[in-house]
Protein backbone atom coordinates (compact mmCIF):
# COMPACT_ATOMS: atom_id res chain seq x y z
CA UNK A 1 0.00 0.00 0.00
CA UNK A 2 3.01 2.31 0.40
CA UNK A 3 3.07 2.74 -3.40
CA UNK A 4 -0.33 4.40 -3.21
CA UNK A 5 0.39 6.99 -0.50
CA UNK A 6 0.46 9.94 -2.89
CA UNK A 7 -2.69 8.91 -4.80
CA UNK A 8 -4.50 8.46 -1.49
CA UNK A 9 -3.34 11.86 -0.24
CA UNK A 10 -4.49 13.46 -3.51
CA UNK A 11 -7.90 11.82 -3.19
CA UNK A 12 -8.31 12.92 0.42
CA UNK A 13 -7.36 16.52 -0.41
CA UNK A 14 -9.79 16.63 -3.34
CA UNK A 15 -12.58 15.12 -1.26
CA UNK A 16 -12.16 17.40 1.74
CA UNK A 17 -11.85 20.48 -0.52
CA UNK A 18 -15.14 19.56 -2.17
CA UNK A 19 -16.80 19.09 1.23
CA UNK A 20 -15.52 22.45 2.47
CA UNK A 21 -17.01 24.15 -0.56
CA UNK A 22 -20.36 22.46 -0.04
CA UNK A 23 -20.35 23.51 3.62
CA UNK A 24 -20.46 27.24 2.87
CA UNK A 25 -23.03 29.20 4.87
CA UNK A 26 -25.56 31.25 2.91
CA UNK A 27 -28.47 33.52 3.86
CA UNK A 28 -30.39 30.57 5.29
CA UNK A 29 -27.67 30.48 7.94
CA UNK A 30 -27.28 26.78 8.55
CA UNK A 31 -25.00 25.53 9.94
CA UNK A 32 -24.03 28.70 11.79
CA UNK A 33 -22.27 27.25 14.79
CA UNK A 34 -18.60 26.31 14.75
CA UNK A 35 -19.04 22.92 16.40
CA UNK A 36 -21.64 21.93 13.82
CA UNK A 37 -19.19 22.71 11.05
CA UNK A 38 -16.45 20.72 12.79
CA UNK A 39 -18.73 17.67 12.84
CA UNK A 40 -19.38 17.87 9.10
CA UNK A 41 -15.74 18.56 8.25
CA UNK A 42 -14.70 15.50 10.29
CA UNK A 43 -17.29 13.34 8.53
CA UNK A 44 -16.11 14.73 5.20
CA UNK A 45 -12.55 13.72 6.08
CA UNK A 46 -13.74 10.19 6.89
CA UNK A 47 -15.68 10.04 3.61
CA UNK A 48 -12.67 11.30 1.65
CA UNK A 49 -10.41 8.72 3.30
CA UNK A 50 -12.82 5.90 2.50
CA UNK A 51 -13.17 6.97 -1.11
CA UNK A 52 -9.41 7.33 -1.55
CA UNK A 53 -8.56 3.80 -0.35
CA UNK A 54 -11.15 1.93 -2.45
CA UNK A 55 -9.06 1.60 -5.63
CA UNK A 56 -5.72 0.82 -3.87
CA UNK A 57 -7.52 -1.79 -1.75
CA UNK A 58 -8.97 -3.45 -4.86
CA UNK A 59 -5.60 -3.45 -6.62
CA UNK A 60 -3.97 -5.02 -3.54
CA UNK A 61 -6.85 -7.52 -3.29
CA UNK A 62 -7.61 -6.26 0.21
CA UNK A 63 -11.31 -6.89 -0.22
CA UNK A 64 -12.06 -6.71 3.50
CA UNK A 65 -11.26 -2.99 3.39
CA UNK A 66 -14.27 -2.46 1.14
CA UNK A 67 -16.58 -3.67 3.91
CA UNK A 68 -15.92 -0.38 5.69
CA UNK A 69 -18.14 1.24 3.06
CA UNK A 70 -21.15 -0.44 4.63
CA UNK A 71 -20.23 1.09 7.97
CA UNK A 72 -19.83 4.47 6.29
CA UNK A 73 -23.29 4.23 4.73
CA UNK A 74 -24.76 3.52 8.17
CA UNK A 75 -22.85 6.44 9.67
CA UNK A 76 -24.03 8.85 6.97
CA UNK A 77 -27.64 7.76 7.46
CA UNK A 78 -27.16 8.67 11.11
CA UNK A 79 -25.98 12.11 9.95
CA UNK A 80 -29.27 12.54 8.13
CA UNK A 81 -31.21 11.57 11.26
CA UNK A 82 -29.07 13.89 13.39
CA UNK A 83 -29.73 16.87 11.11
CA UNK A 84 -33.44 16.09 10.98
CA UNK A 85 -33.77 15.83 14.76
CA UNK A 86 -31.67 18.95 15.42
CA UNK A 87 -33.55 21.12 12.95
CA UNK A 88 -36.93 19.84 14.12
CA UNK A 89 -36.10 20.84 17.69
CA UNK A 90 -34.80 24.23 16.57
CA UNK A 91 -37.86 24.79 14.39
CA UNK A 92 -40.21 24.87 17.36
CA UNK A 93 -38.50 28.06 18.57
CA UNK A 94 -38.68 29.94 15.27
CA UNK A 95 -41.23 32.73 14.83
CA UNK A 96 -41.67 31.43 11.29
CA UNK A 97 -40.84 27.74 11.01
CA UNK A 98 -38.99 26.00 8.19
CA UNK A 99 -41.48 23.18 7.98
CA UNK A 100 -40.83 19.44 7.83
CA UNK A 101 -40.41 19.36 4.03
CA UNK A 102 -37.61 21.95 4.14
CA UNK A 103 -35.95 20.16 7.06
CA UNK A 104 -36.04 16.81 5.27
CA UNK A 105 -34.47 18.41 2.20
CA UNK A 106 -31.61 19.80 4.30
CA UNK A 107 -31.09 16.42 6.00
CA UNK A 108 -30.97 14.61 2.65
CA UNK A 109 -28.47 17.16 1.33
CA UNK A 110 -26.08 16.62 4.23
CA UNK A 111 -26.17 12.85 3.77
CA UNK A 112 -25.78 12.93 -0.02
CA UNK A 113 -22.83 15.34 0.10
CA UNK A 114 -20.77 12.75 1.95
CA UNK A 115 -21.36 10.33 -0.93
CA UNK A 116 -20.24 13.04 -3.37
CA UNK A 117 -17.03 13.33 -1.33
CA UNK A 118 -16.46 9.55 -1.57
CA UNK A 119 -16.98 9.67 -5.35
CA UNK A 120 -14.60 12.64 -5.70
CA UNK A 121 -11.85 10.94 -3.70
CA UNK A 122 -12.33 7.64 -5.57
CA UNK A 123 -12.17 9.26 -9.01
CA UNK A 124 -9.16 11.43 -8.11
CA UNK A 125 -7.18 8.52 -6.66
CA UNK A 126 -8.04 6.27 -9.61
CA UNK A 127 -6.92 8.92 -12.11
CA UNK A 128 -3.63 9.29 -10.22
CA UNK A 129 -3.02 5.51 -10.09
CA UNK A 130 -3.87 4.68 -13.71
CA UNK A 131 -2.84 7.89 -15.46
CA UNK A 132 -0.91 10.71 -13.78
CA UNK A 133 -1.07 13.48 -11.23
CA UNK A 134 -2.35 15.87 -13.89
CA UNK A 135 -5.18 13.49 -14.70
CA UNK A 136 -5.98 13.45 -10.98
CA UNK A 137 -6.10 17.26 -10.95
CA UNK A 138 -8.49 17.24 -13.93
CA UNK A 139 -10.67 14.60 -12.24
CA UNK A 140 -10.78 16.67 -9.04
CA UNK A 141 -11.78 19.80 -10.98
CA UNK A 142 -14.53 17.92 -12.82
CA UNK A 143 -15.89 16.57 -9.53
CA UNK A 144 -15.71 20.05 -8.02
CA UNK A 145 -17.75 21.46 -10.92
CA UNK A 146 -20.30 18.67 -10.51
CA UNK A 147 -20.53 19.52 -6.80
CA UNK A 148 -21.19 23.15 -7.73
CA UNK A 149 -24.01 22.01 -10.01
CA UNK A 150 -25.54 19.84 -7.28
CA UNK A 151 -25.24 22.74 -4.83
CA UNK A 152 -27.15 25.14 -7.07
CA UNK A 153 -30.22 23.03 -7.74
CA UNK A 154 -33.45 24.53 -9.06
CA UNK A 155 -35.05 27.64 -7.57
CA UNK A 156 -38.51 29.17 -7.68
CA UNK A 157 -37.73 31.71 -10.40
CA UNK A 158 -37.31 28.73 -12.75
CA UNK A 159 -40.93 27.68 -12.31
CA UNK A 160 -42.93 30.82 -11.36
CA UNK A 161 -43.26 34.52 -12.19
CA UNK A 162 -43.21 36.73 -9.08
CA UNK A 163 -45.06 40.04 -8.73
CA UNK A 164 -45.29 42.40 -5.76
CA UNK A 165 -48.89 43.28 -4.80
CA UNK A 166 -49.76 45.59 -1.93
CA UNK A 167 -52.14 43.88 0.54
CA UNK A 168 -55.63 45.36 0.92
CA UNK A 169 -58.69 44.93 3.09
CA UNK A 170 -62.26 44.36 2.00
CA UNK A 171 -64.09 44.73 5.29
CA UNK A 172 -62.31 42.39 7.73
CA UNK A 173 -60.95 40.23 4.89
CA UNK A 174 -57.27 40.54 3.97
CA UNK A 175 -56.57 40.11 0.25
CA UNK A 176 -53.47 39.91 -1.92
CA UNK A 177 -54.74 40.73 -5.40
CA UNK A 178 -58.05 38.81 -5.49
CA UNK A 179 -56.91 35.95 -3.23
CA UNK A 180 -58.39 35.88 0.26
CA UNK A 181 -55.75 35.40 2.96
CA UNK A 182 -57.42 35.64 6.38
CA UNK A 183 -59.89 37.57 8.51
CA UNK A 184 -58.58 40.51 10.61
CA UNK A 185 -61.30 42.27 12.61
CA UNK A 186 -59.31 44.64 14.86
CA UNK A 187 -58.70 48.06 13.25
CA UNK A 188 -55.29 48.47 14.93
CA UNK A 189 -54.13 45.13 13.50
CA UNK A 190 -55.38 46.14 10.07
CA UNK A 191 -53.37 49.35 10.32
CA UNK A 192 -50.21 47.42 11.27
CA UNK A 193 -50.69 45.02 8.37
CA UNK A 194 -51.18 47.82 5.83
CA UNK A 195 -48.09 49.58 7.18
CA UNK A 196 -45.69 46.63 7.41
CA UNK A 197 -47.22 43.93 5.22
CA UNK A 198 -46.11 42.89 1.75
CA UNK A 199 -47.90 40.68 -0.74
CA UNK A 200 -46.64 38.68 -3.69
CA UNK A 201 -48.34 36.70 -6.42
CA UNK A 202 -46.57 33.59 -7.70
CA UNK A 203 -47.86 32.63 -11.14
CA UNK A 204 -46.83 29.12 -12.22
CA UNK A 205 -45.27 28.78 -15.67
CA UNK A 206 -46.91 25.42 -16.37
CA UNK A 207 -49.09 22.75 -14.81
CA UNK A 208 -46.15 21.00 -13.15
CA UNK A 209 -45.14 24.27 -11.50
CA UNK A 210 -48.67 24.79 -10.21
CA UNK A 211 -48.62 21.36 -8.60
CA UNK A 212 -45.22 22.05 -7.02
CA UNK A 213 -46.06 25.40 -5.41
CA UNK A 214 -49.33 23.96 -4.16
CA UNK A 215 -47.27 21.87 -1.75
CA UNK A 216 -47.59 23.24 1.78
CA UNK A 217 -43.94 22.53 2.54
CA UNK A 218 -42.80 24.55 -0.47
CA UNK A 219 -44.97 27.48 0.58
CA UNK A 220 -43.63 27.33 4.13
CA UNK A 221 -40.07 27.43 2.78
CA UNK A 222 -40.91 30.71 1.02
CA UNK A 223 -42.28 32.24 4.21
CA UNK A 224 -39.25 31.11 6.21
CA UNK A 225 -36.64 32.42 3.79
CA UNK A 226 -38.25 35.86 3.46
CA UNK A 227 -38.73 36.16 7.23
CA UNK A 228 -35.21 34.90 7.91
CA UNK A 229 -33.57 37.54 5.72
CA UNK A 230 -35.86 40.55 6.20
CA UNK A 231 -37.00 39.76 9.74
CA UNK A 232 -40.58 39.35 10.89
CA UNK A 233 -42.83 41.93 12.52
CA UNK A 234 -44.47 39.75 15.13
CA UNK A 235 -43.98 37.94 18.42
CA UNK A 236 -45.32 34.66 19.76
CA UNK A 237 -49.02 34.57 20.54
CA UNK A 238 -50.05 36.93 17.72
CA UNK A 239 -51.82 34.82 15.08
CA UNK A 240 -53.08 37.89 13.21
CA UNK A 241 -49.49 38.85 12.34
CA UNK A 242 -48.49 35.43 11.04
CA UNK A 243 -47.08 35.22 7.47
CA UNK A 244 -49.24 33.06 5.26
CA UNK A 245 -49.42 31.68 1.71
CA UNK A 246 -52.76 30.80 0.08
CA UNK A 247 -53.62 29.27 -3.27
CA UNK A 248 -56.11 30.37 -5.90
CA UNK A 249 -58.05 27.20 -6.62
CA UNK A 250 -59.06 28.36 -10.10
CA UNK A 251 -55.70 29.07 -11.74
CA UNK A 252 -53.09 27.67 -9.32
CA UNK A 253 -51.52 31.02 -8.41
CA UNK A 254 -50.16 31.37 -4.89
CA UNK A 255 -50.45 34.57 -2.86
CA UNK A 256 -47.75 35.18 -0.26
CA UNK A 257 -48.28 37.58 2.64
CA UNK A 258 -45.38 38.51 4.94
CA UNK A 259 -44.71 41.08 7.65
CA UNK A 260 -40.98 41.85 7.49
CA UNK A 261 -39.00 44.16 9.73
CA UNK A 262 -37.32 45.58 6.62
CA UNK A 263 -39.92 46.73 4.10
CA UNK A 264 -38.09 46.27 0.81
CA UNK A 265 -40.23 44.64 -1.93
CA UNK A 266 -37.42 44.36 -4.50
CA UNK A 267 -35.21 42.45 -2.07
CA UNK A 268 -38.12 40.21 -1.10
CA UNK A 269 -38.74 39.35 -4.76
CA UNK A 270 -35.07 38.34 -5.10
CA UNK A 271 -35.30 36.19 -1.98
CA UNK A 272 -38.43 34.41 -3.21
CA UNK A 273 -36.81 33.94 -6.62
CA UNK A 274 -33.92 32.07 -4.99
CA UNK A 275 -35.93 29.87 -2.64
CA UNK A 276 -34.91 26.30 -3.50
CA UNK A 277 -37.46 24.05 -5.15
CA UNK A 278 -37.73 21.31 -2.54
CA UNK A 279 -37.18 17.80 -3.85
CA UNK A 280 -40.06 16.38 -1.84
CA UNK A 281 -42.39 19.08 -3.21
CA UNK A 282 -41.67 18.59 -6.91
CA UNK A 283 -44.63 17.18 -8.82
CA UNK A 284 -44.73 16.30 -12.52
CA UNK A 285 -48.29 15.23 -13.37
CA UNK A 286 -47.80 15.96 -17.08
CA UNK A 287 -45.29 13.10 -17.29
CA UNK A 288 -48.02 10.68 -16.23
CA UNK A 289 -50.42 12.22 -18.74
CA UNK A 290 -47.85 11.85 -21.55
CA UNK A 291 -47.21 8.22 -20.63
CA UNK A 292 -50.93 7.49 -20.53
CA UNK A 293 -51.34 9.04 -23.98
CA UNK A 294 -48.57 6.77 -25.30
CA UNK A 295 -50.28 3.70 -23.84
CA UNK A 296 -53.66 4.70 -25.27
CA UNK A 297 -52.10 5.56 -28.65
From Swiss-Prot:
Keywords: Cell membrane, Membrane, Transmembrane, Transmembrane helix. It comes from Bacillus subtilis (strain 168). The lineage of its organism: Bacteria, Bacillati, Bacillota, Bacilli, Bacillales. GO terms for cellular component: plasma membrane. Its main location: membrane. It comes from the Bacteria. Coiled coil: none annotated. This is Uncharacterized protein YphB. It is a multi-pass membrane protein. InterPro entries: YIEGIA. It is found in: Cell membrane. Pfam families: YIEGIA. The chain crosses the membrane at residues 3-23, 38-58, 103-123, 128-148.
Amino acid sequence: MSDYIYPIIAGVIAGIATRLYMLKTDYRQYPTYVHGKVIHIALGLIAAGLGAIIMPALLQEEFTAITFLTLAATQFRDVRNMERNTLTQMDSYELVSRGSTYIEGIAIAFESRNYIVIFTALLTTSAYVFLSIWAAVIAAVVCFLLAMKFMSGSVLKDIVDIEYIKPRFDGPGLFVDNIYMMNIGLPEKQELILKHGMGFILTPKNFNSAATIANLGQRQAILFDVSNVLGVYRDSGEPSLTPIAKRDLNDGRVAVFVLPQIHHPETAVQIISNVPTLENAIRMPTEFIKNQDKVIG
